[in-house]
Each structure stands twice: as C-alpha cells, then as structure tokens.
Amino acid sequence: GANAAPQGQGKVTFNGTVVDAPCGIDAQSADQSIEFGQVSKVLLNNGGSSTPKNFDIKLTDCDVTNYKKAGKAGTVSLTFSGVQAGTDMLQTVGTTGTAILVKDPHGKAVKFDGATATGVSSLVDGDNTIHFTALVKKDTSGNDVAEGAFSAVANFNLIYQ
C-alpha cells in the first residue's frame, strides 16, 4: 500500500540546564504567574493591600546529605531582581501606580535589588518547598492608584550554603 501523505506537522523543543547544585528546580516553579484578579482602587489608595497570594518555589531531588559532607550548611536563600519601587517592592508595568510586595518564608519583605538575600531555609533530602506571599499595594510615587491592567516580572536566583 501507498504511504499516506502527512496531514499536519509540528515540532517539539526540549530545553534544560545542568547545574552544579544540590537540588533541581521544579519546572512549574521556574516560570510561574500569580493572578491577583481585580483589586479595589479605593482600598489601595487608602493604604490597603490586595488579598495575599501564596506562591511556592519547589526544589526537587535534593541531595543534602552529600552536600553537607562537602562542608556546606545545607541551606538555601534567594535573591530577586526586578524594577524596584522604593526599597522593598516590585514596580508594576502600566500606569496604575501599583507595586508588588513579596514576603519571604520568614515574613520579611523581599528586596528586588538582585543582591539582598531572603531569609535562609534549611533543606532536607528529596523535595523542598519554599513559601512566599505576594500583595498588591500603592507604589511609592505618591500618586493615586489609577484603573487599568498591571503586571510585573521578577527573576530569582538560588544561593545554596
């Protein structure tokens, strides 16, 4: 019999990076989106904040035992980078006058300067989850919050100790 002609085609691309680290990072944690939905302008203008949104960074297949044998503490902290709003918020893109406040697992505000590390989290063998909380607030410009869409991007780096 004759071979059937193709009726559509496509492509699958596989990417990854091998790192010298005691843990891998879950693919969903490496690139995630947090949806705040609709946030009240009046609430933000009066100094309030949105409902907190929790997000996690999941580390996978950690081999902490061998890492500690090399004289390491077996802990991790993170640095975040992005467009700063004041000293401890992430400026949003758009004209809403909003910023994102992120708190680390210890309840401390994350700095988006790419250098100041979050609090340290101890690691165990296997999978580890680091919990964060994000809130929308009025930014530090002094202007009132305006209606419209907002977004912000922060990049993070893991620092193993």
UniProtKB/Swiss-Prot annotation:
Write down what this protein is called. PRS fimbrial major pilin protein
**Briefly, what is this protein's role?**
Fimbriae (also called pili), polar filaments radiating from the surface of the bacterium to a length of 0.5-1.5 micrometers and numbering 100-300 per cell, enable bacteria to colonize the epithelium of specific host organs.
Subcellular localization, per the record?
A: Secreted; Fimbrium
Q: Can you supply a Gene Ontology BP term from the record?
A: cell adhesion involved in single-species biofilm formation
InterPro entries named in the record: Adhesion_dom_fimbrial, Adhesion_dom_fimbrial_sf, Adhesion_dom_sf, Bact_Fimbrial_Adh_Pro
Provide the coiled-coil residue spans. none
Q: Does the keyword Secreted apply?
A: yes
Q: Provide the family line.
A: Belongs to the fimbrial protein family.
Q: Alphabetically list the UniProt keywords.
A: Fimbrium, Secreted
The record's listing under Pfam families reads: Fimbrial
Q: Which domain of life is it from?
A: Bacteria
Principal subcellular localisation of the protein: secreted
Q: What GO CC terms are in its UniProt record? A: extracellular region; pilus
